[in-house]
Curated annotation (Swiss-Prot):
A GO cellular-component term linked to this record: cytoplasm
InterPro entries attached to this UniProt entry: Adenylosuccin_syn_GTP-bd (IPR018220), Adenylosuccin_syn_Lys_AS (IPR033128), Adenylosuccinate_synth_dom1 (IPR042109), Adenylosuccinate_synth_dom2 (IPR042110), Adenylosuccinate_synth_dom3 (IPR042111), Adenylosuccinate_synthetase (IPR001114), P-loop_NTPase (IPR027417)
Protein's recorded name: Adenylosuccinate synthetase
Functional pathway: Purine metabolism; AMP biosynthesis via de novo pathway; AMP from IMP: step 1/2
Family classification: Belongs to the adenylosuccinate synthetase family.
Taxonomic placement: Bacteria, Pseudomonadati, Pseudomonadota, Gammaproteobacteria, Chromatiales
Reaction(s) catalysed (UniProt annotation): IMP + L-aspartate + GTP = N(6)-(1,2-dicarboxyethyl)-AMP + GDP + phosphate + 2 H(+)
Binding of Mg(2+), residues: 14, 41
Keyword ATP-binding found: no
Entry EC no(s): 6.3.4.4
Organism of provenance: Halorhodospira halophila (strain DSM 244 / SL1) (Ectothiorhodospira halophila (strain DSM 244 / SL1))
Length: 431
């Protein structure tokens, strides 16, 4: 039997999952996306060449990997086709390697328009979405009025569903937000054209994955965003619109939860966040340490281009993420960004309303008032960039990683020491 591995982010996204997934696909026959949409930006660097994927699983660059987009993903057909064409222009036969669940809810132009209109109306209180229609598409899914990929293959069915949907959303756009409305015929024609192109790529994803498991192929489930952005367990309402935890891998692809063998949590050696919301260990952009992390780590979002907020490693939040996901191992990324710092700080608790707290508050209002309690550790002057053996790391770097293991309660299985796939230390292979 093969091994089924789930990769999830343990922070607020941008942990470096794309590179690690790409590295792990050497041992995976199938790579599956199970939630989110094209709001996720996975950056891969292979032989110095950078590729940013938003929807298609990172394994698409592997010749022998089958890539799957599961039913838990909200699908922008336009964005997907654009990504497919970009890959084909680079000589990657994406259509041959990609299969998509026909049950995927679609992101339509009205969802993007609603996303922008809402953020504009909220002003300074805006959540800081990517503006790509993810939230409104998930809303329609839950409200049972959404259009699915399979609807694009049936003109009359699509016309009826789309007409009802646009009547609803155009009313809100026009009378509530004072925003332009969507033209029914234009949206219908575009959707039908997308359906023609995507129909050959559809498959029963649950059945496909189950069949692959029976043949003994390893399967990698690729998460997007991060645990602290989970719609239920994250810093609500400053979260994404899907379940980003490991449990969603089963529901978002149609396989049973007992088929998941190993859960790998990706975390930076420090912490970053894009958009609004509480961030206890945040450092100011003009702070010397905050500037170091931002500049050395090239902390700009792959999807939005926004500068990421940077701070020290938060062991309290990561420990909670480890519990929610039942992590088997941690992968620490961007360790090399900490090179040259004299002192490193680890958040080991919070001081909330005068009391010491060692767990992550569930209410965002309480978390916003929390002050980090730090434990200082000595840094290292040596470069860790490109190191591929754990024993070759500086002694203080190994001590830092060991302390993270103790605080989070999960072994460090992998360490990334640079953006290239080869700049990776493996202590325990998930496969």
């Amino acid at each position: 039997m093969g091994t089924n591995v789930v990769v999830v982010g343990t922070q607020w996204g941008d942990e470096g999952k794309g590179k690690i997934v790409d590295w792990l696909t050497e041992n995976a026959g199938v790579v599956a996306r199970f939630q989110g949409g094209h709001n996720a930006g996975h950056t891969l660097v292979i032989d110095g060449e950078q590729t940013v994927l938003h929807l298609i699983p990172s394994g698409i660059l592997r010749e022998d990997a089958t890539c799957v987009i599961g039913n838990g993903v909200v699908l922008s057909a336009e964005a997907l086709l654009e990504e497919i064409r970009e890959l084909e222009a680079r000589g990657v036969p994406a259509r041959e390697r990609l299969r998509i669940s026909p049950s995927c809810p679609l992101i339509l132009p009205c969802h993007v328009a609603l996303d922008h209109a809402r953020e504009k109306a909220k002003g300074k209180a805006a959540i800081g979405t990517t503006g790509r229609g993810i939230g409104p598409a998930y809303e329609d899914k839950v409200a049972r009025r959404g259009v699915r990929l399979s609807d694009l293959f049936h003109r009359e069915r699509l016309a009826q569903k789309l007409g009802e949907l646009l009547d609803y959303h155009n009313f809100v756009l026009k009378h509530y937000f004072g925003a332009p409305t969507m033209d029914f015929q234009e949206v219908l024609d575009q959707a039908l054209a997308h359906g023609e192109e995507l129909r050959p790529l559809t498959a029963d994803v649950g059945a496909l994955l189950t069949a692959e498991m029976r043949t003994g192929r390893n399967i990698l489930f690729e998460g997007a965003q991060g645990t602290l952005l989970d719609i239920d367990h994250g810093t609500y309402p400053f979260v994404t619109s899907s379940n980003t935890c490991a449990g969603a891998a089963a529901a978002g692809t149609g396989v049973g939860p007992r088929t998941l063998d190993y859960i790998l949590g990706i975390t930076k050696a420090y912490t970053t966040r894009v958009g609004q919301g509480p961030f206890p260990t945040e450092l100011d952009f003009d702070d010397e340490m905050g500037m170091h992390l931002g500049e050395r780590g090239h902390e700009f979002g792959a999807t939005t281009g926004r500068q990421r907020r940077c701070g020290w490693f938060d062991a309290v939040a990561t420990r909670r993420a480890a519990q929610i996901n039942s992590l088997s191992g941690l992968c620490i990324t961007k360790l090399d960004v900490l090179d040259g710092l004299e002192t490193l700080r680890l958040c080991v608790g919070y001081r909330c309303q005068g009391e010491l707290c060692e767990t992550l508050p569930s209410e965002v209002e309480t978390l916003s008032e929390c002050e980090p309690v730090y434990e200082d550790m000595p840094g290292w002057a040596e470069s860790t960039s490109g190191i591929e053996r754990y024993e070759d790391l500086p002694e203080n770097a190994r001590a830092y990683l060991g302390r993270i293991e103790e605080l989070v309660g999960v072994p460090v299985a992998m360490i990334s020491t640079g953006p290239d796939r080869n700049e990776t230390i493996v202590r325990q292979s998930p496969f």
